């Protein structure tokens, strides 16, 4: 079978297995959407079939946009992850919540906005109403002690974005992400063509139309967006480069874990492969995306059914694995590089520290690769800060300094990396 036939078969099998009225999916490889397909019924009343351009509500995937907005303001120095919520929403004075814990779902605040929001589908429509509901919320767990998912926390983070940026959080997301990235089919309100949401009777194949939530008001940053799989794939490609959002905040079982959290992102483990993403659900809709940063392969899946989002998350993960098979990475050709900087003369080659051998090399940048059993780790990467002074910016000992020590003739005699001494030959550690 061709790559598209393989992916199409997988999608159609899962649609039948999960009894989804319709399902739409896309796959991205090396920054390009390489496959997309939609099957089923987008609108049961009219019998209209979906296309890859059909919008679906993506629910909590919206949180990844809100998290990216918070991180963008952090990068600009306008807020910090250790800031208390009250530093930006003064009405929250006395609250123990910090922005970082809210992003990672370990703030301990209750899950939902106080009230009957999921019974009456009535959400706080104004910032004042949201802040008033926040004051009624219960601190159900001690901050930082347990993972506890909270839509309320992300609604409050949206208010932080609004106050810090000086405009609505929705406008900030549009200006910073949707328009620059060309996510033309991602919007806060439904834009036709769009699917209708359904509940599938568990004991028959009858569809029931779900109540529509047109606008969730001040809670929108927690789950309002509509989108398409192709747009979500482009979004995942963008997020893959935002290193700070991938820092794991909670890890209960380091050996056997299969699901963890970064800052606004879910982390999935399948065998030795780690993928990031997020899922989402609103009445009548489920959605998920998953992305392998190492291989630059990702997938997004949306459907119009009220059923656990785990089903479409499994489809997305399966599509990524299938994409790795049918769209293998192209081998990167070797090309000669420019001469290394003169300062690095005498640095490149093999060095030893405490019985461990490292190769320092130039690959358009200074790198250090451990030899022997430790070679499986990523190379350390250095950037020059001053003459004979480098900062480790990636890999082993990230953040630590590397100094070049020279002899009286000006030749590099030894290195000091993270205060450890490196010599050209193995030497016994000495206090002299």
What are these model-derived regions, one by one?
Residues 21-23, 56, 168, 286-287, ...:
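Short loop/turn microsegments at loop-to-beta-strand junctions
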Residues 81-94, 181:
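Short, glycine/proline-biased beta-turn/loop segments that scaffold the active-site neighborhood
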Residues 41-44, 306-308, 420-421:
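A short acidic/small-residue loop/turn micro-motif
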Residues 310, 314-432:
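Peripheral terminal and inter-domain segments
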Residues 2-58, 78-83, 87, 135-137:
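Short, conserved catalytic-motif segment at the N-terminal edge
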Residues 288-291, 295-305, 413-417:
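Short, well-ordered beta-strand elements
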Residues 32, 39, 43, 95-283, ...:
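Short, surface-exposed loop or secondary-structure junction motifs
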């Amino acid at each position: 079978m061709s790559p598209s036939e393989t992916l199409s078969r997988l999608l159609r099998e899962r649609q039948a297995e999960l009894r989804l009225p319709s399902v739409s999916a896309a796959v991205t490889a090396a920054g390009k959407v390489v496959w997309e397909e939609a099957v089923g019924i987008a609108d049961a009343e009219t019998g209209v079939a979906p296309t890859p351009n059909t919008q679906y509500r993506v629910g909590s995937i919206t949180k990844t946009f809100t998290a990216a907005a918070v991180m963008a303001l952090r990068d600009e120095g306008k807020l910090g992850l250790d800031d208390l919520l009250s530093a930006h929403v003064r009405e929250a004075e006395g609250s123990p919540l910090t922005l970082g814990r809210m992003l990672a779902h370990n703030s301990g605040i209750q899950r939902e906005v106080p009230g009957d929001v999921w019974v009456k589908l009535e959400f706080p429509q104004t910032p004042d109403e949201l802040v008033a509901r926040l004051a009624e919320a219960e601190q159900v767990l001690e901050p930082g002690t347990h993972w506890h998912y909270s839509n309320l926390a992300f609604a409050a983070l949206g208010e932080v974005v609004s106050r810090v940026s000086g405009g609505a959080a929705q406008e900030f997301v549009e200006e910073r992400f949707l328009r620059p990235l060309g996510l033309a089919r991602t919007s806060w309100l439904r834009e036709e063509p769009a699917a209708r949401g359904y509940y599938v009777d568990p004991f028959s194949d009858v569809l029931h139309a779900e109540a529509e939530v047109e606008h969730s008001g001040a809670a929108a940053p927690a789950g309002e967006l509509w989108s398409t799989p192709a747009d979500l794939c482009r979004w995942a490609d963008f997020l893959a480069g935002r290193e700070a959002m991938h820092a794991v905040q909670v890890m209960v079982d380091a050996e056997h874990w299969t699901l963890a959290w970064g800052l606004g992102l879910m982390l999935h483990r399948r065998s030795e492969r780690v993928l990031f993403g997020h899922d989402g659900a609103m009445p009548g809709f489920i959605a998920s995306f998953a992305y392998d940063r190492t291989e630059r392969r990702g997938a997004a899946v949306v459907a119009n059914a009220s059923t656990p989002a785990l089903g479409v998350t499994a489809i997305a993960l399966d599509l990524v694995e299938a994409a790795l098979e049918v769209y293998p990475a192209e081998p990167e050709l070797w090309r000669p590089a420019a001469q290394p900087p003169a300062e690095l003369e005498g640095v490149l080659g093999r060095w030893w520290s405490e019985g461990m051998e490292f190769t320092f090399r130039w690959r358009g940048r200074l790198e250090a690769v451990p030899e022997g059993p430790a070679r499986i780790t990523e190379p350390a990467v250095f950037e020059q800060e001053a003459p004979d002074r480098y900062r480790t910016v990636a890999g082993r000992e990230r953040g630590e300094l590397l100094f070049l020590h020279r002899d009286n003739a000006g030749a590099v005699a030894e290195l000091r990396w993270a205060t450890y001494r490196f010599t050209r030959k193995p030497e016994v550690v000495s206090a002299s």
